[in-house]
Amino acid sequence: MADVLIVVGSESDKPRIEPAFEVLSKAGVSYEFHVSSAHRQPDQTADLVKGARKKGFRVVIAGAGLSAALPGFAASVTDLPVIGVPFAAGPLNGLDALLATAQVPGGVPVACVGIDNATNAALLAVRILKA
């Protein structure tokens, strides 16, 4: 069983989340990586995140660009801590994703790190796991 579930919305996002893989590995934290879109595969994505606790995951890292629905969507279907990583994309170069990740409605908590900062997302996950 892995401790951290890492989800991004598109295969093209993988290079942006890969720094988290290195941080988690160095810290001895197991993780599992998935590509699943809140927009294109909402049912599959909901099932993946809803079942995370039963599979032994303790933290979710969700990365997305543009409208960046994935972190908030993930937080809406789990009670696990969700860390959102906004990705630089489109004409606003990630500002839209940052605001979407940081401004999730009340009652749907998402911890938000800086644009393209998968390293800090992984470091935060490690701290949560060690708390």
Pin down the residues of each PLM region.
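Glycine-rich phosphate/diphosphate-binding loop of Rossmann-like nucleotide-binding domains
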Residues: 2-40
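Glycine/charged-rich beta-loop-alpha catalytic/anionic-binding loops adjacent to active sites
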Residues: 2, 29-32, 55, 80, ...
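C-terminal binding/interaction regions
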Residues: 8-15, 19, 93-131
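Short glycine-rich or small-residue beta-strand-to-loop segments that form or flank ligand, phosphate
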Residues: 3-8, 32-34, 60-62, 83, ...
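Glycine-rich phosphate-binding loop
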Residues: 47-86
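Short, solvent-exposed amphipathic alpha-helical segments in soluble enzyme
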Residues: 20-26, 49-50, 76-79, 127-129
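N-terminal beta-loop-helix "entrance" segment that forms/cooperates
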Residues: 33-55
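Short, acidic/turn-prone active-site loops that include or flank metal/cofactor-
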Residues: 87-91
